[in-house]
Amino acid sequence: MRHSRRVALVVSTLLISCFASSCGLLVRSRTILRHGKPVVQGQSPKLLSATKTQLNARITNLYNPISSFQATVDMTPSLGSVYKGQIKEIKDVRAFVLYRKSADIRIIGQTPVVRTRAFDMVSNGIVFQLFVSSRNLFVQGDNSAPATSKNALENLRPDAFLSSMLIRPAGPDETLVLMDDTDEEKAEYALLFLKKGPTGEDVASRKIVFDRLDLSIARQIVFDAEGGIISDTRYAKWTVFDNNSFPAHIDINRPEDGYGVAMDVMQMQMNKTFADKDFLLERPEGSQLQIIGANGSDAKPASPPPP
């Protein structure tokens, strides 16, 4: 036994010496990328470390100070998804986003060039209303109502924007799990939010990705009960607006609904005071009404208003 150990030690020593001197082998340095750029040898940026509690606190510190905002954004809606093999973008849409805690949101989109109203949608966190000017169509229903239109843009929901634009910290029903996802091409933390499934098992409800170079939030993925992706949102150009940090570029993709929206913030006013009427969307006279049933029921067909 002692002889075997001595032999193993000698072999290990020889192997280490061989590799240390290259032993005639071809040695290649692997390129390390950070933000898509090669790292210069000896100048590797320092990676920041944090616990799951500290990362959740960062989310809280971003979320809590914002009670409202009014933003002007350049919006690029897109139809399709990577799962469908095709994505078509609609360029140069200007939009105005109004938000008030806890869940009031209104988004008014303007057509390219002429800047007439393309759509107007509002939600109080429970129900939503959407007016599509090109079709003179007024849609209303629960936030949880299914996407039923063959026109993906008619399936826009204000709540989908809100859940992506404002990143919530962990709720009382969520458990946190932290993973270090650092390799040659990226340096990230992945913070998983777990909820209890119907049979008591842990189910991932969302994942938030942090850049380890500065611990900024780079991405948020929200999952359905089966693990499918409801939304995949990427964040960039974090900017301070009125002493509050907010991403100036937000790229929302909703593969199950078949659409996405990229937004670039042009102007932002934080913690603005709104009146209730600012979140009131009245049905235009002569528009067709489509009511999407509650609890997943089918949408009622569009109908004209009574005379």
Indicate residue ranges for each PLM-predicted region.
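An acidic-aromatic
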Residues: 25-28, 101-160
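Buried hydrophobic packing residues in well-ordered domains
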Residues: 59, 71, 107-108, 128, ...
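Extended lipid/amphipathic-ligand handling interfaces
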Residues: 57-59, 94-99, 121, 233-240
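Sec-dependent bacterial lipoprotein signal peptides
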Residues: 1-21
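Post-signal peptide N-terminal segment of secreted/secretory-pathway proteins
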Residues: 75-119
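Flexible, processing/modification-adjacent segments and terminal tails
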Residues: 50-53, 132-206, 283
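N-terminal leader/targeting segments and the immediate start of mature chains
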Residues: 23-92, 294-307
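Gly/Pro-enriched, hydrophobic low-complexity segments
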Residues: 24-25, 33, 176-293
